[in-house]
A protein has these predicted regions:
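Aromatic- and glycine-enriched pocket-lining scaffold segments that form the walls
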Residues: 176
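Acidic/polar, low-complexity intrinsically disordered N-terminal segments immediately downstream
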Residues: 5-94, 100, 126-130, 136-143, ...
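An anionic, turn-rich surface loop/hairpin at beta-sheet edges
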Residues: 94-116
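Sec-dependent bacterial lipoprotein signal peptides
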Residues: 1-3
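A recognition module on extended beta-rich or small alphabeta surfaces enriched in W/G with H and D/E
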Residues: 111-127
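Conserved, compact domain cores that house catalytic/ligand-binding motifs in diverse enzymes
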Residues: 180-185
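Conserved small/polar residues in nucleotide/adenosyl-binding loops
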Residues: 186-193
Length: 194
């Protein structure tokens, strides 16, 4: 027994055209942020905490990156490299030429791991108010938010540093199955102390 039935297209255009339109939209949003983006970067899900990176994207495929002072040797330093938004597992933001600030999180150290971070990110959601990303290698979710109008990276970073200074840190002791572990919390980083 056979039958024929008409199949209606679910989408108005092909998957390739929809992907190209999405890639164009991603590029327009990345380059359209007047003051750039704050990238809340997590190199690994639970080991290192998060880092604030500041990025500006050009239509020519360049990205300028700077970061909070604990990451940089010289505060205020900017490093320029190339980026692209490409089709892969959906739209992917790829920092595909070496950027000393960003790639330090994905560079292996002598044991082969380093910070275990990413330099390619699947774009989960994107609009002018923010971008939700997932590390392509690690699967760690991160976000980018536009730096507010009238705010510079320096003033934003200074406010962040004042908040850090307001929290001097603390030490707490955890008892896990009879083993006592002291954990110090300073400058928004947790460290095991013995």
């Amino acid at each position: 027994i056979s039958s024929c039935s008409d199949e209606n297209d679910i989408f108005d255009s092909s998957s390739a055209r929809r992907m190209n339109a999405m890639l164009q939209e991603c590029n327009e949003i990345l380059t359209g942020a007047e003051n750039g983006w704050i990238f809340e970067y997590y190199p690994e899900d639970s080991k290192y905490g998060g880092f604030q990176l500041y990025m500006t994207f050009s239509k020519e495929g360049e990205v300028k990156v700077t970061a909070e002072s604990p990451i940089l040797e010289s505060p205020g330093e900017q490093v320029t490299s190339m980026y692209q938004v490409k089709a892969d597992m959906g739209p992917v933001l790829s920092f595909d030429t070496y950027n000393r600030i960003l790639h330090q999180f994905s560079d292996p150290n002598p044991d082969g791991l380093g910070y275990e971070g990413d330099y390619e990110f699947v774009i989960l959601t994107i609009n002018k108010d923010g971008i939700e990303l997932r590390g392509k290698k690690t699967g760690v979710k991160m976000q980018m938010i536009p730096l507010p109008a009238g705010t510079t990276w320096e003033s934003y970073s200074n406010r962040l540093n004042k908040m850090i200074q307001a929290f001097p840190g603390f030490t707490m002791r955890l008892n896990i199955d009879g083993t006592v572990i002291a954990v110090s919390y300073t400058h928004l980083r947790a460290h095991e102390t013995r």
